[in-house]
């Protein structure tokens, strides 16, 4: 198998969506629009998009990751779509953001708006907090195992890639170009951006 071939085995999670049974049990885990409507998945209408900044990731997915590395002989967990999609207006985001900054969650991405600038920083810090939490739980449960976040945005990422580089041993950039409008050389451009931030770490 993989071990005999000297391969590293990673599990994969995808925290960005849940099915109806999860929504029924925990509607507060789902991202919401400004009017409070829960957010349906754009390509799977039977699924719901989760909030990346609240208890679904910080509590539930933390325990999922702990269970995976406790029960299975894997050397890490890679998460796809872990950083959320768009601004979330769920009860947790509204309360936590207001408590942290004194602002309401902004309705639009306006760099001139101090609320948007505060939200961008708050979201960034929350995402790095959950990545650190998952890495701590995974490495603390199975020695040598690590958390690997998918970070395919390169220079266009909303995350500070230099900070992320200091947190992880390797980076994967999931570049699928499903729209058909990305230049063929964009993956190479991403690799150069990651190399600039990561130094000699593998990408």
Where are these regions (language model features)?
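Aromatic- and glycine-enriched glycan-recognition loops and surfaces
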Residues: 1-7, 58-60, 126-133
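Substrate-binding cleft/loops of secretory-pathway carbohydrate-active enzymes
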Residues: 20-21, 78, 85-89, 127-190
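Active-site clefts of carbohydrate-active enzymes
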Residues: 190-203
């Amino acid at each position: 198998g993989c071990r005999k071939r000297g391969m590293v085995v990673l599990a994969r999670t995808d925290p960005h969506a849940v099915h109806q049974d999860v929504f029924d049990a925990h509607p507060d885990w789902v991202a919401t629009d400004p009017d409070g409507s829960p957010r349906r998945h754009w390509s799977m209408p039977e699924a719901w998009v989760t909030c990346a900044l609240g208890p679904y990731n910080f509590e539930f997915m933390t325990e999922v990751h702990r269970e995976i590395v406790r029960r299975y002989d894997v050397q890490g967990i890679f998460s796809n779509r872990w950083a959320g999609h768009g601004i979330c207006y769920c009860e947790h985001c509204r309360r936590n953001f207001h408590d942290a900054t004194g602002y309401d969650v902004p309705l639009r991405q306006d760099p001139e708006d101090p609320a948007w600038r505060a939200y961008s920083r708050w979201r960034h810090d929350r995402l790095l907090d959950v990545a650190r939490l998952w890495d701590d739980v995974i490495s603390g449960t199975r020695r040598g195992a690590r958390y690997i976040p998918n970070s395919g945005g390169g220079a266009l990422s909303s995350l500070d890639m230099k900070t992320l580089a200091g947190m992880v041993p390797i980076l994967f950039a999931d570049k699928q170009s499903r729209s058909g409008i990305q230049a063929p050389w964009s993956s190479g451009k991403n690799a150069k951006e990651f190399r600039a931030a990561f130094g000699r770490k593998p990408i």
